[in-house]
């Protein structure tokens, strides 16, 4: 598995490619994503364990979307059952669920690290304020920096797991190796991902104008763009 470092402009091309893949079968995309969001809502509202369960099966569901997108891109069909293909695959189900547990563990770890940093930095800022006789701008600035670091860490974890899912399902990679490769791919392609994020933000504003109806197109195009980024960055 080779990981490419692509040009920043690829971030725009991913959405163009996502639009192309979406146009191959718009109805199938909409049906698949409606089922996806219904599953997410139903699972997440289960008391006590719902959100934990969704975090664990989430990578498998996302990987199933990648499999369906690849089938469609290669001349096959995109079907609703593709969404569950990772969970129904006897060989890949276990590794995908392990990947979900890794994701859950990383999220908890980052959140704990953020809390500890906030506590320690807050204590240091308080001590500085006591010594200098005033709080000034130090305490809010510390909070902003810690929040920014926490947000960036969460984004990196999310992006790495987003790539790790298809690496496990489509390439047969083991979960920990897939996470390692996913993180490396994200770090190698920060600029195109930032460009893609900027494109998404602009499109999100446009999609929200007509009573949010534009999201019926933007949501599947964004998922298809995610597949396009995977195809662009990874090669066998």
What are these regions (language model features)?
Residues 1-236:
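Hydrophobic alpha-helical membrane segments
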């Amino acid at each position: 598995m080779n990981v490419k470092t692509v040009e920043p402009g690829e971030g725009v091309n991913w959405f163009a490619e996502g639009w192309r893949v979406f146009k191959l079968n718009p109805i199938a995309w909409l049906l698949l994503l409606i089922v996806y969001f219904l599953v997410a809502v139903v699972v997440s509202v289960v008391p006590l364990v719902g959100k934990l369960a969704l975090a664990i099966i989430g990578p498998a569901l996302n990987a199933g979307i990648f499999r369906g997108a690849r089938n469609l891109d290669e001349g096959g069909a995109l079907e609703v059952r593709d969404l569950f293909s990772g969970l129904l695959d006897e060989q890949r189900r276990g590794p995908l669920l392990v990947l979900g547990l890794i994701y859950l563990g990383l999220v908890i770890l980052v959140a704990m690290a953020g809390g500890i940093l906030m506590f320690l930095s807050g204590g240091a800022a308080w001590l500085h304020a006591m010594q200098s006789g005033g709080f000034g701008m130090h305490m809010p600035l510390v909070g902003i920096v810690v929040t920014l670091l926490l947000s960036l860490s969460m984004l990196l974890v999310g992006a790495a797991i987003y790539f790790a899912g298809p690496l496990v399902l489509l390439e047969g990679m083991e979960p920990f190796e897939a996470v390692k490769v996913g993180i490396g791919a994200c770090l190698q392609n920060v600029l195109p991902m930032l460009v893609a994020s900027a494109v998404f933000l602009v499109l999100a504003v446009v999609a929200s104008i007509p009573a949010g109806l534009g999201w019926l197109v933007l949501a599947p195009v964004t998922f298809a763009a995610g597949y396009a980024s995977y195809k662009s960055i990874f090669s066998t």
